[in-house]
């Protein structure tokens, strides 16, 4: 088998895909890598300010108004979709609309049943409990959530051994909002306890243009229609990516240009970041080139690809692949990943026979 460190992508870019130790390269297009970097001022504060996801927003408006009229908390809801599409922002908005407190946490941070019980007993009437990456909850935590979601109560075990007894503690009515990138990893009993489930879609370019223009105004950055259009086109259908790129292009315009983000400035800055006209970065192109050059276009298993890229399998499946699939650059088959004709053309490779 050929050594992986002999692999080279097109256009003379040398790629280290051995996973060797070294400082990790920042990916400007990784929507999962910089949620905490989002400036609070850029977050929409109301459903009217939230751009895109129109059908979902209309449903949520109705749910909020109906719950207010009845004086009840919102039903538990599950928001699914790739990272960076606004699941956390929507939860913040809904909590504000209902006039209640938001208590955020994440699946990986909840290790023991006691952790979950402590959070649940701290909630007040109507509060929102937001669990990001809810698909990563362990079974013990889920067992605590079942009665909490269904009956607004938790079972507490007192004592040990034969003398142990269980008491039920009532909880205030609350709303659990779960966010996930991997609905398929969630258990059916947990899924069944959500009264409403929705999947957030990638954004259209015109929606991202609105987001870029709005946030450029908030940041005090002059931007032309052409500049906003280029940023939107290369943001992978993801608002969080658009915000990250806007900040990087702002820096470039300030230092190299006259401070205004026009089409030429945006193009130059994004090319410097390694972001091409489809919104692919160096790692995306490495992924596609690996399938095409090393594995004859596929099929190749995601486990093999993750090892070759030096990335965790979950990262490849949750971060890299969704946009490549959405863009028609790869296909998932029962035997593995396959590069499409579109991928060959984009990277400048001749399409193989039957490809």
From Swiss-Prot:
Subunit: Homohexamer. Forms an RuvA(8)-RuvB(12)-Holliday junction (HJ) complex. HJ DNA is sandwiched between 2 RuvA tetramers; dsDNA enters through RuvA and exits via RuvB. An RuvB hexamer assembles on each DNA strand where it exits the tetramer. Each RuvB hexamer is contacted by two RuvA subunits (via domain III) on 2 adjacent RuvB subunits; this complex drives branch migration. In the full resolvosome a probable DNA-RuvA(4)-RuvB(12)-RuvC(2) complex forms which resolves the HJ.
Entry superkingdom: Bacteria
Any one Gene Ontology cellular component term annotated for this protein: cytoplasm
Chain sites annotated for binding Mg(2+): 88
Entry keyword annotation includes Lyase: no
Protein name: Holliday junction branch migration complex subunit RuvB
Residues that, per the record, bind ATP: 42-43, 84, 87-89, 150-152, 193, 203, 240
Region span, Large ATPase domain (RuvB-L): 4-203
Function: The RuvA-RuvB-RuvC complex processes Holliday junction (HJ) DNA during genetic recombination and DNA repair, while the RuvA-RuvB complex plays an important role in the rescue of blocked DNA replication forks via replication fork reversal (RFR). RuvA specifically binds to HJ cruciform DNA, conferring on it an open structure. The RuvB hexamer acts as an ATP-dependent pump, pulling dsDNA into and through the RuvAB complex. RuvB forms 2 homohexamers on either side of HJ DNA bound by 1 or 2 RuvA tetramers; 4 subunits per hexamer contact DNA at a time.
């Amino acid at each position: 088998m050929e050594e992986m460190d002999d692999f080279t992508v097109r256009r003379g870019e040398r790629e280290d895909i051995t996973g060797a130790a070294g400082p990790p390269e920042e990916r400007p297009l990784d929507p999962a890598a910089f949620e905490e970097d989002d400036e609070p001022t850029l977050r929409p504060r109301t459903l009217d300010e939230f751009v895109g996801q129109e059908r979902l927003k209309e449903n949520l408006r109705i749910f909020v108004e109906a719950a207010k009229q009845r004086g009840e908390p919102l039903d538990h809801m599950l928001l699914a979709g790739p990272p960076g599409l606004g699941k956390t922002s929507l939860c913040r908005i809904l909590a504000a609309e209902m006039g209640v407190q938001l208590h955020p946490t994440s699946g990986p941070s909840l290790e023991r049943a006691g952790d979950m019980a402590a959070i649940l007993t701290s909630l007040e009437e109507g509060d929102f409990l937001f669990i990001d990456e809810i698909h990563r909850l362990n079974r013990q935590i889920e067992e605590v959530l079942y009665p909490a979601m269904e009956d607004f109560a938790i079972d507490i075990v007192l004592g040990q051994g034969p003398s142990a007894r269980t008491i039920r503690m009532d909880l205030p009515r609350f709303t659990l909002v779960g966010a996930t990138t991997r609905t398929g990893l969630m258990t059916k009993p947990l899924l069944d306890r959500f009264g409403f489930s929705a999947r957030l879609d990638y954004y259209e370019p015109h929606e991202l243009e609105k987001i870029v223009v709005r946030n450029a105004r908030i940041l005090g950055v002059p931007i032309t229609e052409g500049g906003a259009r280029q940023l939107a086109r290369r943001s992978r259908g993801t608002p969080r990516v658009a915000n990250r790129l806007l900040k990087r292009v702002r820096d470039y315009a300030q230092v190299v240009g006259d401070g205004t983000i026009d089409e030429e400035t945006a193009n130059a800055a994004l090319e410097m970041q390694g972001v091409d006209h489809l919104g692919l970065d160096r790692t995306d192109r490495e992924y596609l080139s690996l399938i095409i050059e090393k594995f004859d276009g596929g099929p190749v298993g995601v486990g093999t690809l993750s090892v070759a890229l030096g990335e965790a399998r979950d990262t490849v499946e949750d971060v890299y692949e969704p946009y490549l699939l959405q863009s028609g650059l790869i296909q998932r088959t029962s035997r593995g990943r396959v590069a499409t004709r579109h991928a060959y053309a984009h990277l400048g490779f001749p399409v193989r026979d039957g490809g």
